[in-house]
Curated annotation (Swiss-Prot):
The lineage of its organism: Bacteria, Pseudomonadati, Pseudomonadota, Alphaproteobacteria, Hyphomicrobiales. Part of the ABC transporter complex ThiBPQ involved in thiamine import. Responsible for energy coupling to the transport system. It holds the Pfam family ABC_tran. Keywords: ATP-binding, Cell inner membrane, Cell membrane, Membrane, Nucleotide-binding, Translocase, Transport. The gene is thiQ. Its main location: membrane. This is Thiamine import ATP-binding protein ThiQ.
Amino acid sequence: MRGKGVPVRLDKVSFSYGEAPLTFDVAFAAAEITAIMGPSGSGKSTLLNLVAGFETPQSGGVLIGGVDVGAAPPAARPVSMVFQENNLFAHLSVEQNVGLGRSPSLRLTEVDREAIDGALARTGLGGKEKRLPRELSGGERQRVALARVLVRDRPVLLLDEPFASLGPALRDDMLDLVAGVHAERGMTVLFVTHQPQDARRIGRNVVFLDNGTVAATGSADDFFAGAGPEAFRRYIGASAGNAVSQDIARKRT
C-alpha cells in the first residue's frame, strides 16, 4: 500500500497498562491531517502505537485502508512514524539514516539513491548527506527523520510530538514542511500535539482524548471556535482558542 492516504479505524479497541483501561472507537479520514489532543496520560501515544503495531489490542481491531492489520508486525504495516526522539543511528551519515527507509541492509539501487537525493532536497538537507547526526541541529535531525519517511512512501504518517523540543519558529517551519509534503502526496496524517497553535496551523480535524477514551471528534475550525466539549476548552485554556492570529499561514489541503 503506497501513495495516497487511506482511512484508519480503531474498531472498539481496548488496551490497558495495569489498572488503566483505554478504549478507542474512532475513524480517521483518508488523506487528511488530524490532530490528536488530550491531557497527559489520556492515551495519545498509545493510540499511535496501536496503529503502528508497537502495541496489541486486547480486543477490537485496527483497520488501515479497510484491512485488519492486527496480525501484521510493525514493519509490514503501511505506516511511517516520527517520534520526539528522532531515532537516528549516531554512527551513520545523513544519507545512510535516510537510506534505511528504503533498505534496512543499506543495499541501495540507483532508484533508491535517487529517492534519497530527492527526499534530502525536499527537506532542505541537500549538501549535508555525509554529516553525522551529532553535527546537525535538533531541527535538522528531525528533517532527517522526515526524509526517511518520504523514501518509505507509506500512505499513513504518524507523528508523536516530533517537534515538541524545537523553538516556536523551527516548529512552525517543520509543521509547514509536513503540510507541504501532505499537499504533494496526500497521505493520511495523525499527529499528537499539546499545542493548540500546531493543531490550528495544519490540522483539518481534531480527535480529543480524555480519561482513556475518545471524548470528541470534529473539524479543527469548530473545535477552536468553541464547539468542542467543555473538557477540551478547559484543556487548552480559556483564551487558547484565540491565541493564534487569524491571518496565520494555513497549510491545509
